[in-house]
Amino acid sequence: RVIDRLFFILYNCFNALKRNGLKQRIIKINFALSLKEEIRLNSGDKIHRCKVNKEEIMTEILCGIMLVAFFVVMIGVGFYSRKHATNVSGFVLGGRSAGPWLTAFAYGTSYFSAVVFVGYAGQFGWKYGISATWAGIGNAIIGSLLAWVVLGRRTRIMSQHLNSATMPQFFGERFGSSALKIGASVIIFIFLIPYTASLYNGLSRLFGMAFNIDYSVCIILMAVLTAIYVIAGGYMATAINDFIQGIIMLFGIVTVIAAVLNSKGGFMAALDGLAKASDPAVTDTPGIFASFFGPDPLNLLFVVILTSLGTWGLPQMVQKFYAIKDEKSIKKGTII
């Protein structure tokens, strides 16, 4: 925004210079040393002033550089992973060579994606208050830990024995039914469309708020970048990028929690402020949002079960067990 304004002012100044001639006309740009700066462009007949914030400019420039670097790394990882995508198995499963760290982070980032920052933090956080923490605990124990313990080793062994690379192929080989294979493919194709759309929606809204980028531009940009590195490197490209993004997410979550608690004067002060919050549309009970059982414990229980056990059947989650290197890696991945 600041750069756009500067270009607009420069354009007007040069037009004024052109109209009045260049003789004895100069452009002066004066920067103050304080945080509040004023840029003066003297075109001879008029002085244009634009007050800007030095920190704001530097922050936007730094964010832009980091964003471009992130995109470059994503695409670079895609082309780097091409060596693993020389055949169908390599493209879909990375040659079954993904280690425990890559697989664990790929599982985690697929599970705790936009829902953490948009769904849980926004909808569930306000609807249930502090009790929404149970959703995160349930997801971590039931949706992640228990899924790795129950499904990890069995899925890895059976998928390799049946030489299956996808869930529909696994069903077809396991039960000897082409109809089941086709049916599973159709179901996955249909219902993953709104699922994927919700992820792009959440991601684009976050980018839009953070960088003031148009929502449609974010959608197109994310889709194009994802398509490039997925088509170029297949599963291994997504696993490596998920690992990188997982580290960023962990750092971001810790930073957000620390910033929020610091702005509210600590955990107890934040909890006290939450106790004073009220929403007649949810409940009239005072202090209910600070309760660890929340305004609707039964409904919250269903949310925990749905979001924890429901992921056990998602193909993009189960496929992580298809691609992991060996049983030893599954044990390490479970801990990670």
Where do the language-model regions lie?
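Short, Lys/Arg-enriched N-terminal segments with co-localized hydrophobic residues
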Residues: 30, 38-57
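Membrane-interface "cap" regions at the ends of multi-pass membrane proteins
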Residues: 53-119, 230-233, 246
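Lipid-exposed faces of alpha-helical membrane segments in multi-pass integral membrane proteins
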Residues: 62-76, 139-142, 146, 183-190, ...
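Hydrophobic alpha-helical segments and their helix-loop junctions in multi-pass secondary transporters
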Residues: 77-84, 192, 196-200, 204, ...
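Membrane-interface helix-loop-helix modules in multi-pass membrane proteins
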Residues: 92-163, 298-310, 317-319, 323-336
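Membrane-water interface regions at transmembrane-helix termini and the short interhelical loops
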Residues: 126-128, 151-154, 205-210, 224-245, ...
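Helix-loop-helix module between adjacent transmembrane segments
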Residues: 135-230, 303-310
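Hydrophobic alpha-helical transmembrane segments
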Residues: 180, 286-307
